[in-house]
């Protein structure tokens, strides 16, 4: 008997597209709505004067997760996407030295010895112990926690020691590395979660392990091509994606999500609703006041959120001699982190990330030119900063710092086009609550069972995907949130869904 159930998805970001792909493959009727003119949400492209930039994510970590999502749709990711493994993965620049980071163990050992002269025993211990942590925790991270019973599982109880509570990532790395700068090489990844390495829970020490074990990839054309590939699968399966279609509100009757109302007034009803919009924004803008009892506007305002970012996308008439990825640490990294997360103030000495993707991918800019992407972590909008007043000053500081730290002293003369996104525009234009680009903070009290559930606990027939639900922020975990919600919906309607326990990638990880 044909499956006639209709799934409405709010947002064509990575989570919404992945869920749409998985569900349309299983015969569900899928309708996705997004306010933008392009698919992808924060994974969409920015196109300017022949230059292409990724709006948000630029690192493809845990490629096996993405591969599995396509496998669950009886497809191969490589038939839709061209993957480019990066070696080195990235360059880290301190005030007094730099290091190229490799997933190749031999090259990595040589670099660590060259730069830190500390030996490589700690690195080997790190790889061995964090492999064990990953194997213990990954099955727990990728399961549903929609009920207390599902939370109190034997797997999680067995894995509790690997949470290393209440240690932070930075402190946890002390068992492997003595030098602070050596630890920074293995804990800056907390930025993927928008957190300080001194606050980020120790379980996330497995993030750098995953980089070193499985590598980092670029996708030809930018990571936005992943969104395009998922949209193609949805179309092949008969699903629909409606762009320039902003949702005004959810249709809620008797405590259940029944559909959506579009801004132009049209209403669409379905059997299940998946929310891929920023969680806190959706709860405060798409749900009428008084409906929610747990995630009220007052409750959401009091929760902890990630940092924000200042983004500078530069179309240049030259190609600089820079690696694909460069991370530059502030000269006083501790103070920089404190200013972002505690003081919520601006500083002249900041850390930043530069993607020079044209070094690896000639499809992103006209011949002889380059698309340069610059990300500067900033306080979220709890800071109260007036970004209209600060925007140009920060831009000038960023360009000055690119010259001082990376040698791009002539960069102003080579800018053909540019776009800026501030913490304020993240909130006003992109509908990111408080401009917190990595959503709710990933502290323990906002993770697992205590993060908004994939089967949303306040509304029947409503499911969540994206960084604001379990497992959390970052492309691989967002894809996992889509898998969890798609599986829950499939089980509800008695449609078979392959379990992650059968995953070839996970078996490989355990080898």
UniProtKB/Swiss-Prot annotation:
Pfam family example for this protein?
Amino_oxidase
Which reactions are catalysed by this chain?
A: 15-cis-4,4'-diapophytoene + 4 FAD + 4 H(+) = all-trans-4,4'-diapolycopene + 4 FADH2
Give the metabolic or biological pathway: Carotenoid biosynthesis
EC numbers, comma separated: 1.3.8.2
Q: Name one GO molecular function term.
A: 4,4'-diapophytoene desaturase (4,4'-diaponeurosporene-forming)
Q: Which EC class is this protein assigned? A: oxidoreductase
Q: Sorted alphabetically, which Gene3D superfamilies does this protein's record hold?
A: FAD/NAD(P)-binding domain (3.50.50.60)
Q: Can you tell me which family this protein belongs to? A: Belongs to the carotenoid/retinoid oxidoreductase family.
InterPro entries reported for this sequence = Amino_oxidase (IPR002937), Carotenoid/retinoid_OxRdtase (IPR014105), FAD/NAD-bd_sf (IPR036188), Phytoene_DH_bac_CS (IPR008150)
Q: What happens when the gene is disrupted?
A: Cells lacking this gene accumulate the colorless C30 carotenoid precursor 4,4'-diapophytoene.
Q: Which UniProt keywords apply?
A: Carotenoid biosynthesis, FAD, Flavoprotein, Oxidoreductase
Entry's Gene Ontology BP terms: carotenoid biosynthetic process
Q: Which domain of life is it from?
A: Bacteria
Q: Know the name of this protein?
A: 4,4'-diapophytoene desaturase (4,4'-diapolycopene-forming)
| Biological function | Involved in the biosynthesis of C30 carotenoids. Catalyzes four successive dehydrogenation reactions that lead to the introduction of four double bonds into 4,4'-diapophytoene (dehydrosqualene) to yield 4,4'-diapolycopene.
Q: Which cysteines are joined by disulfide bonds?
A: none
